[in-house]
Amino acid sequence: IAADHFLAYRQSTGLMTVLAGLPWFTDWGRDTMIALTGLTLSTGRYQDARDILTTFARYIHHGMVPNMFPDEGTDPLYNTADASMWYFYAVGKYLDYTGTPEDYSFVQETIYPKLKEIIAAYEHGTDFSIYMEEDGLIHAGSGLDQVTWMDVRVGDWVATPRHGKP
């Protein structure tokens, strides 16, 4: 199956992960959460999906799902405004596909506290000037860091500025 080429065992976490596009990209939070349904759930790989959700839950920091895990095994990077929101989507899809009492317990015990942490961090403001405004929309960065999927930057020049509420 083609999905096999995107799933890999990450030695540093001891669990499965999604590779966004080797050799250029390893595991990226946004890409992983978007692809989780097609690569694991629709193919019946429920344990792989659970492992991936667990890995990203372990690394949530200041309410932010990692943007990427560097190849070198160093600390994850967190410069993304939307990976945490895609995480909610992936958890919902996981329950849609599995739905057993055991799966609900897993989410209740392992994932739900992290979802609450994400909401609280966005409400109060987190790293990279990411926060929820009074209207409920997300403010995505100050312009100093590129925190959306359109993140091209060459020196001080930003090809597609997307800060604020783009």
Where are the language model's segments positioned?
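Acidic, mature catalytic/reactive cores of soluble proteins
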Residues: I1-P166
